[in-house]
Regions:
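Alpha-helical phosphate/pyrophosphate-handling elements in metalloenzyme active cores
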Residues: 2, 52-112, 162-163, 209-254, ...
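Short acidic/histidine-centered micro-motifs embedded in hydrophobic/aromatic stretches
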Residues: 53-57, 112, 129, 182-186, ...
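Conserved N-terminal diphosphate/IPP-binding helix and adjacent helical/loop segment
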Residues: 1-112, 122, 126-141, 197-199, ...
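All-alpha helical catalytic cores of prenyl diphosphate-utilizing isoprenoid enzymes
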Residues: 44-51, 74-79, 149-150, 157, ...
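Divalent-cation-assisted or electrostatically stabilized phosphate/pyrophosphate-binding catalytic cores
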Residues: 133-155, 204-218, 245-249, 271-297, ...
């Protein structure tokens, strides 16, 4: 279990079917998704080197891509997106009066979400020139950019193979075509958001509104797909079900809040908790929300200084980073950004309440109640 989840006061020891706390669900789902990813890699990825590189990325192999003993494996992420889809799936089933589904019908889709997310991380690390991911060397820093691009491409293709999964059998797969289409749409939106993010690096006219449009694609597209797709499978592919827009809105708002919190951690997060060097976003002059808010709120002199620093074409020095931090503190940029994260969290909870059929129904549905708790964690996490 990633260190960032330790603040969720519980012990992960129950199965997904009987779990009663958020951390129980997350632990059970993560174990199930990891097992499914391993099966997908074995069944779909023929090249052993690619399987090794992917296993390394997930923390299951060393830098030589040789599998590690279970006790030595690194934490490979939170499995947040699969958990979102599975909790929405089970929550929507519960709302219809059905018992928790032990047949794993939503597992292939949840697995595909995690593979798409990780393909994007491998490519993001290349584009951002990041040397660390989850406290370990990034894939590209070990095998080079060209091979790492190929590893990411392999993961993206494997995601769609995973989504088909056992639904290839006759009679299975109600709604599978729709969630595959949703996953493809989310992938396209993610690339559009990433293009905007890269474009921001060389522009000096980026606004807060442009930022929100960017993260709606880069981050929120996949969380929207997760919550919408999970609910859609529970409603057996009934695309016109009135609850589905609320599930989609929940995922979108949660994804927006998640990315804003990520921006805060990119400046003020601790390396021991984020797995990345503290202040990396400042040194790369990323126009994240705290910086854009500072440019909007700063005095003319401070705005000019910050603009000049972010117009540089090289990574900032230590003194220059300190200057940026001083300006951000003067403008209370961290608190302002957190307000935006909290606002999106509140909007996510409102949408979730609508999806549940009201506040009482939300509290009475253990899966959706866990999503309520997860929303609070996402917008206040430290890693």
């Amino acid at each position: 279990m990633p260190a960032a989840l330790d603040s969720l006061d519980s012990t992960a020891h129950r199965t997904a079917g009987s779990a009663s706390t958020l951390q129980d669900y997350l632990a059970a789902y993560a174990a199930r998704i990891d097992a499914e990813i391993a099966l997908v890699l074995e069944a779909e990825v023929e090249d052993p080197w690619l399987r090794g590189a992917i296993s390394y990325h997930f923390g299951w192999a060393g830098t030589d891509f040789v599998p590690l003993p279970a006790a030595q494996r690194a934490a490979g992420g939170k499995r947040l997106r699969p958990a979102l889809s599975l909790l929405c799936y089970q929550g929507a089933r519960r709302r219809q009066g059905w018992a928790a589904d032990e047949s794993d019908d939503a597992i292939p889709f949840a697995t595909a979400l995690e593979l798409v997310h990780n393909y994007s991380l491998i490519h993001d690390d290349i584009m951002d020139r990041d040397l660390l991911r989850r406290g370990r060397p990034t894939v590209w820093s070990i095998c080079g950019k060209a091979q790492a691009i190929n590893v990411g491409n392999c993961l993206h293709a494997a995601a769609f193979a995973a989504c088909l999964g056992r639904q290839r059998a006759p009679g299975n797969g109600t709604g599978v075509g729709d969630v595959i289409a949703a996953l493809a749409t989310a992938s396209l939106q993610m690339t559009g958001g990433q293009r905007q993010d890269l474009m921001f690096e060389t522009r000096d006219d980026v606004t807060v509104d442009m930022y929100f449009q960017m993260i709606a694609g880069k981050t929120a597209a996949l969380t929207t797909c997760a919550t919408y797709g999970g609910a859609l499978l529970a409603y057996t592919g009934a695309r016109a079900h009135p609850a589905l827009p609320a599930y989609a809105e929940f995922g979108r708002e949660l994804g927006m809040g998640f990315q804003i919190r990520d921006d805060i951690l990119g400046i003020w997060g601790m390396e021991s908790q984020t797995g990345k060097p503290s202040g990396g976003d400042i040194r790369r002059r990323k126009k994240s929300l705290p910086v854009l808010l500072a440019l909007q709120e700063a005095s003319p002199g401070a705005r000019a200084r910050l603009g000049a620093l972010y117009a540089m074409t090289t990574d900032l020095t230590g003194d220059q980073e300190s200057d940026v931090r001083s300006i951000l503190e003067e403008c209370r940029a961290q608190a302002l950004a957190q307000r935006h994260a909290d606002l999106h969290g509140q909007r996510a909870l409102s949408a979730l309440t609508n999806a549940a059929g009201g506040a009482d129904a939300l509290r009475d549905n253990p899966f959706l109640a866990a999503l309520e708790q997860l929303t609070g964690f996402v917008t206040t996490r430290t890693g």
